[in-house]
Amino acid sequence: LGILGVLPSKQVYAGLSNSTVVLFGGMFVIGAAMFKTGLAEAIGIAVVKKAGTNQVPLMAAIMLVTIVLSSVSSNTGTVACLMPVIIGICQAAKISPSKELMPLAIAANVGGTITMIGTPPNVIVTGALSAAGLPTFGFFEFAYIGIPLSIIIVLYTLFIGRHFVPDKQAGAMDEEAVKAAAEEAGASGDSAPKSKTKMWISGIILLGVVACMALGLKNLPLHTAAVTGAILCVVTGCLKEKEAYAGIDWVTIFLFAGMLSVASAMEKTGA
């Protein structure tokens, strides 16, 4: 559009400064800090191990912790983080991994419906409203549908769906192969000891940002809260600068920003 002269360069790149785009960028960094510090993995391990080795309680714990984590962070990252832990527990309990991994994947998908940044389609429809000059969805407005939907999915899976989950029996699994698969899916693969202090810091930052968004403070817009949290993640050492940049889903950022520019062009030309 800029090359063809439909829009001046200022308008072509204006979408990158849109408040919703900035909000996404900030939350991506905060989510990355959860995984890098090991907080997400620690939460997952604690909850899943607390459930024991009985198939149904284990399935319930897996789905609940996955829904919570995927609502404020990457669905793929959540699955990659929990997958090796779940496979290890399944092996120890003599449970088919497929019986727990399918609920893990389903929970990650449904958990993303709870917040505006939970899954790319939420981003796209929010972008469409913004591009049309209409009020956009609030950060938690998806939760009115997402939370009841999540509850229904969990209950259905526990009482009915689990009977239809394929029972893929497997022999001894190669731990290195499992780790490699998790890393390919998005896990950090960093086996270095994690700092509990940084875990606490990243958790407090996340809770603080989410609380500000839930309260809807007039003097602290959503995007300002998200960026402040992202900066704190770097300043406190939870993430290095390069890790913060790597944690941002740039495809989603440019998709959203690009839609705004296209909408501006259509409005200007009357298309």
Question: Can you describe what each PLM-predicted range is?
Answer:
Residues 65-74, 106-117, 211-218:
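Transmembrane alpha-helix interface/packing and boundary motifs in multi-pass membrane proteins
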Residues 6-96, 247-271:
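Membrane-embedded alpha-helical segments and adjacent helix-loop junctions characteristic
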Residues 1-23, 29, 142-269:
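Hydrophobic transmembrane alpha-helices of multi-pass small-molecule transporters
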Residues 1, 75-82, 102-103, 114-118, ...:
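Hydrophobic alpha-helical membrane segments of integral membrane proteins
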Residues 2, 35, 91, 115, ...:
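Short polybasic/polar patches that bind polyanions
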Residues 4, 25-26, 64-65, 81-82, ...:
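Membrane-embedded alpha-helical core segments of multi-pass
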